[in-house]
Amino acid sequence: MKRIGAAACALLAGMIVASTKPASAAGVLRIDEVPVGELDPSKASDVADTLLLFNVYDTLVAPQPGSTGLAPHLAESWTVEGNVYTFKLRSEVRFQSGNPLTADDVVFSMERMQALDAGVSYLFKTVEKTEAVDPSTVRFTLSAPYAPFVAGLTRLAIVDSELVKENLGDGDGEMKDWGQAYLSAHSAGSGAYAVVSHNPQEETVMARNDGYFLGLAAAAPDTVRFRYGLEAATVRTLIANGEHDISSQWLPPEVLKSLAAEGAQLLTESGTGAFYLKMNTTKPPLDDVNCRRALSAAFDYEAGIRMVALTDTVALGKPATGVLPVGMLGSLPAERTLRRDMDAARKYLAECRHKPEDFSLELSWIAEVPLEERFALLMQANFAELGFKSEIVKVPWALFTERVGKPENTPHFSQLFTDAATGDPDALLYQMYHSSVPGTFYSPEHLEDAEVDQLLDKGRAESDPARRGEIYTALNERLLSLAPTIFAYDRQTVFAGSTRFTLPPMTDPAKSFGIPTYGLSFRFVEMKP
């Protein structure tokens, strides 16, 4: 039996200048992201949704600062016996409604996540049964060994089941709509911030919850205005004029450079994601592995890194060694940095059964992410050196997500910035490369490879961290050989910020978190006088 205690909570609590009393007016924090802002935590999948989840709701476990480990959060401890995970809940937690947290809330939250089958519900496919042992104890029984289960719980928001049940909408069965209509516009969490108003296309307004069980930073903002869909030029002007505080992560490099030069601070997160150039392995000429290898070798990785450099010390990316960011379980060592090799590219092309002059490659880029157009241009220039013609196509995100559902509609090349939602390699790789997963924006490669499937399944079943690392290293090597993807760079997410606040998890590596977006938890913000 393994037992994980609450002592690790001290690390997290230590990041906060605890305040159980209402603080003096600490002002308004203004932030933006790409729409839409999905408020229902069971449907959260994108950046804006996740940011709302981490601020409005809490989870059983949470990442530890300066570490890749996990600590109890709403739980005070847990034990593991085979496929059975038992969590003891903290006694002092209350939802924003005033209702106490109980095991029934955890059961409801898991069953709701599974019933809606949306967001990151794929993380809980192996959960066979969730039961309240007593008011403060909840037990999960899995149908099969699943090593990333506890990491997945960082994305299971615990909702106030009593409040939701009082607000069920139309639908079939006992739980009707499971409160979807209500939770799309209201919060039912225990988090440090409560929703005041919500328009998923325009703005979410949140107010601090001074009854939060862990306390907030002494000068945490009283109000957060979270806006959606601001243009880069607008954000630049607003920050420069002192009218905005934190940008989205999608500002073009030159805007970030300009803001930094004008005195804005740059906030960073790294270690959990990457930028991928994904090849449709079902569409000629990319159905030939040697063609894919040729294009991978022809890509100018160093030019890509130069394109995203912001200052002498900050860039949007770091050199990649493979599919997993350097430092993640199973990643390859930094000295194996991927580099352009035109001699190897020509050798691979000579072994390809297709002739480059017979094809025009469709190089897509997402309309809402201007940086991707530059990488499309870089690919076009690189691939032309091998004799490939190409067409650059701008695709709105909504249309792109529709197209990639079917291999025949998927472009030759798709671009994706993504992160491991839980910090675990399974969360990054399974949805991208396992052949059992339907085509989504994560998997426009449409790869089918028995060895890849086998390694992904082994990684899920193996509980020993060292052996899991070996499995994911082998998977990394296999994917480098198959070349379904050009691993452009390991991602470093950069936000521009005003100088009106400090946010240690985004500026001090010793206080950073191993889960994307968690560092933007508003309770860690200290507004300046």
Give the ranges of each region predicted by the language model.
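N-terminal lobe/hinge region of extracytoplasmic solute-binding protein
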Residues: 32-82, 111, 188-189
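Extracytoplasmic/peripheral linker and loop segments enriched in polar/acidic and small residues
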Residues: 37, 391-401, 428-499, 528-529
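Gly/Pro-rich hinge or "lid" segments in bacterial periplasmic/extracellular proteins
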Residues: 64-65, 157-216, 223, 342-343, ...
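Surface-exposed binding/hinge segments that line
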Residues: 79, 122-171
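Ligand-site clamp/hinge motif
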Residues: 181, 211-257, 389
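Periplasmic-binding protein-like
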Residues: 282, 286-327, 374-375, 479-484
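Structural transition elements
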Residues: 315-352, 367-374
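Long beta-strand-rich cores associated with HINT superfamily self-processing modules
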Residues: 495-529
